[in-house]
Amino acid sequence: MDLLCAGELNVDLVLSGFQSAPLLGMEIMGEDYTECLGSSTAICACVASSLGAATGFFGKLGRDHYGEIALQGLKKYNVDTTLVEISPKYRTGLTVSVSTADDRALVTCFGDTIDAFRQDEVPLERAN
């Protein structure tokens, strides 16, 4: 393994297709949404893998809908996920992005996985 990335894993729920973000107390209609792998560490792993580096990820996911999306997002880019712990005791984190053509607003809930992450568990010997 050329690169072992370790960190939080979460999913982005991106809402789009409107001119401006709603104000508090207001509801607007969007045109589209997408659920995709988020977290800067995971995105770094995917980019490194797509550039040809043998890349793995160490992290934790809930055995839930968002955990499955995150896991499939890593696998889509051939990131080794054998060091990703998946457990029903965790709740996968989520970022909701309200995105317009000019800007975005983000709300992130880390879930339980970031608190369960321990640096001393990272198997550094697995990276070259």
Model regions and ranges:
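Conserved N-terminal subdomain of the carbohydrate kinase-like
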Residues: 26-27, 50-128
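Glycine-rich phosphate/adenosyl-contacting loop at the front of the ribokinase-like
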Residues: 1-60, 65-69
